[in-house]
A protein has these predicted regions:
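N-terminal carbohydrate-binding accessory modules
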Residues: 1-8
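Aromatic-lined carbohydrate-binding surfaces of glycoside hydrolases
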Residues: 10-228, 258-271
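Substrate-binding groove of N-acetylhexosamine-processing glycoside hydrolases
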Residues: 27, 77-80, 129-137, 141, ...
């Protein structure tokens, strides 16, 4: 299968708002991405970018956040490494929805569409466009030689709700869709006037339900290129029937977006690779049937989300998803086959251990001595998932429910014969958890900043440690009782 049939761009999306890797990780990863068939990066910095001047509070230059983002020198290094590897960079900066990283700050709280929610910016506030253009100006000026800019604009959860927007929508021929399109047009016109060489990409989801006439009358096709995103596997893949005819009549240039991670669960730890492969196979079919309708299909972004929003917990860490990314790129170029699977497996170091694309029953054997950057973290996460299964099996066991439930403990109505066997189980789990934490901390320090490691440990390991310690102490206290009711 000739990949060039479906556009010349194959962009790997790096969502840096969750677990941004250190620069040395990119030095190892970027050459591989080029080898696997990627042509560029869709770089979503969010709050890890070193914004300055009036925007200093939202980025990595603010003192309290220095450890979780990039310095100017590090950000430049990332761009340099990408360039050296022949990877074009397309920066992505949110300009409408998913604005939590800006609107959470007191300085810009007044720009929220709904005062208590920091997600969406108000398109009617006179200070909104100056803020958005300031974000764009700093991003564009930092990225030399870019040809495209992605301005996000997806999932605008709150639109047309403030008093001014409500009146504007009521007075408009097309209501809320006009509010959305007018904001995008204002941004796009600023970019065209200031950076006439830049082509502008937007996520397409807010456009899907809009009538052809609305899109046509706003001349949106003159200014932006939609990136159609759909991340589900074949069984749940569904785009509107009219999307290709409608978009091709409005937009001369169209993109697609698949997913290699961050799309099968908001707190997923390891990608369900089968689902991601299926997503890419279905996209290939979708494009095969419809791409001839499009004047020019630009290419595809392989998205890898790190958080579902700014406040969400981290989902799959990038090293755990490298096998999924490698296979999805291969599938995009050649289709899925046993031969493709084996080629990718061998290149990643799955020699003595099978390369599973279907989730395994846990606990499961863990591979070792793999060949991709960060494999040590990836197998550490496998260990964590194995451990979590053992932990849940223990704390939800019949033995605890039958002989040490809260009522029994509160009333000192426990059987010491049954409790004695629990102490070794809790002790063993705590010892293994300590080993797991030690291993993961060492391996993560090679790739991640301390702030991220602390968050991951605090989210995933600390609650289990607290619960096990509490259960062990409760058991010991019950065993010390000399009399029982």
């Amino acid at each position: 299968m000739d990949a060039l049939t479906f556009g010349s761009h194959r962009l790997v999306h790096l969502d840096l708002k969750g677990a941004p890797p250190r620069v040395n990780y990119f030095e190892k990863l970027f050459p591989l991405l080029r080898t696997w068939g990627a042509t560029g990066l869709l770089l979503e910095w969010e709050d890890t970018f070193p914004y300055n001047r009036e925007l200093t509070p939202i980025g990595s230059n603010r003192p309290i956040n220095l450890a979780s983002g990039y310095t100017v020198q590090e950000a430049r290094q990332i761009l340099q490494i990408a360039g050296d590897c022949g990877l074009a960079v397309i920066p992505l900066v949110q300009t409408f929805g998913h604005m939590e990283f800006v609107l959470k700050h007191d300085e810009w709280r007044s720009l929220r569409e709904v005062e208590r929610f920091p997600s969406s910016i108000c398109p009617s506030n006179p200070q909104t466009l100056p803020l958005v253009t300031s974000l764009i100006r700093q991003i564009v000026n930092f990225h030399p030689d870019i040809q495209y800019l992605h301005i996000g604009a997806d999932e605008v959860w709150h639109l047309g709700l403030c008093s001014v927007c409500t009146k504007r929508a009521a007075a408009s021929k097309y209501g809320k869709p006009s509010l959305y399109l007018e904001h995008i047009l204002a941004i796009a016109q600023y970019i065209q006037e200031t950076y006439p060489y830049l082509k502008i990409i937007v996520w397409d989801d807010m456009l899907r339900s809009m009538d052809f006439q609305v899109l046509k009358e706003h001349y949106i096709g003159k200014y932006v290129e939609p990136m159609i995103w759909h991340y589900n596997s074949r069984d749940n893949f569904s785009l509107p029937q009219d999307i290709w005819d409608k978009y091709s009549a409005v937009f001369p240039h169209i993109w697609a977006a698949t997913a290699f991670k961050g799309a099968t669960g908001s707190c997923q730890h390891i990608p369900i690779i089968r689902n991601h492969v299926s997503n890419h196979e279905k996209w290939l079919e979708e494009l095969g049937a419809n791409v001839n309708k499009v004047h020019e299909f630009r290419g595809t972004a392989f998205t890898g989300w790190s958080r579902y929003d700014h406040y969400a917990t981290m989902c799959e860490l990038l090293p755990t998803a490298i096998p999924s990314l490698a296979l999805c790129l291969k599938v995009w170029l050649h289709g899925y086959s046993e031969q493709t699977h084996m080629q990718v497996a061998n290149s990643l170091g799955y020699i003595d251990h099978p390369f599973h694309i279907i989730p395994q029953l846990r606990p499961a054997p863990i591979p070792n001595n793999l060949l991709f950057p960060g494999w040590q973290v990836a197998v550490g996460i496998e260990w964590f998932i194995n451990f979590r299964t053992k932990y849940h099996n223990t704390i939800t066991s019949e033995q605890i429910s039958t002989w040490m439930n809260p009522w029994q403990v509160a009333n000192n109505n426990t059987n010491p014969m049954q409790l004695e066997s629990l102490i070794p189980a809790f002790t063993d789990l705590l010892l293994e958890l300590s080993s797991l934490e030690g291993y993961l901390r060492v391996q993560m320090e090679n790739i991640y900043f301390p702030y991220m490691i602390d968050e991951w440990m605090g989210t995933n390991l600390q609650p289990m440690k607290v619960k096990l310690t509490e259960l062990k102490e409760t058991t010991e206290n019950q065993l010390k009782l000399s009399t029982r009711v």
